[in-house]
Amino acid sequence: MIEVRNLYKSFKADTGKKGLFGAVKESFFAVNDMSFSLDKGQVLSILGPNGCGKTTTLRMIAGMLEPSSGTAVVNNIDVRADKHKVKSNIGYMTNNTSLYDRLTVIETIKFFAELNQIPVEIYKKRAEELFSQLDMNDYLNKKIADLSTGMKQKTSIVRTLIHDPDVVILDEPTTGVDITGQSIIMDLVNSIKQQGKTIIFSTHQLGEVKDIADKIIVMAKGKKLFDGTTSEYQAKKPNHSFNEIFTEITSG
């Protein structure tokens, strides 16, 4: 279960003005009063344009970024109180794959698994299953530097799931992936949903949301504009597409 209450995150930005002691900066809220709850086994999709606060929200929940105020509780553990324990229960894929170019796909997964002290017999079996599900078997000995953006995304997903986490957070997992690859990735997300994992994923692809997400949050300029079930989202405009509803929410 995930419980987020009144999360705020502020940063300082350059105003372009000069003061007595140099550049004048102003604070702004990248995330402004985010609250929601997610039960075990549910899937939440966070939607919104670039810069709306999706990534900042996910990083705070995953314990990668300290909130300015507010709380995030994952599986009854306060993230701010015990980041290490929370991180051991979470698989977090950033929207920047952050892979080592000189390593092959196999070496990348082995390195991450050993770093997290996952027994060989466990991570090998898990990796084989994920490679097969993501249609990656022809690329396992290729260096990261030689992979397409889509294949790098898939490698990052395997790295995220290799320790079989209870909670999975995916930040725009299909970015830069072709249509076939998007379908393969979302099939995997649906598969891990069936295993009872709790999942949060952000996306620009509204078509990915309808058949997988149990709940939807729409963000703009750091604020939550909609929070409800997929059915409630569609019920706002029963005869309109997901895209049309999204446009109405974010332009209101």
Q: Which stretches of residues belong to each language-model region?
A:
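Conserved ABC ATPase "signature" region
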Residues: 110, 114, 121-139
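Catalytic Walker B motif of ABC-type/P-loop ATPase nucleotide-binding domains
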Residues: 168-171
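Conserved ABC transporter NBD signature motif
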Residues: 70-81, 85-86
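Helix-to-loop junction immediately C-terminal to a conserved catalytic motif
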Residues: 62
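Conserved ABC ATPase signature
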Residues: 143-147
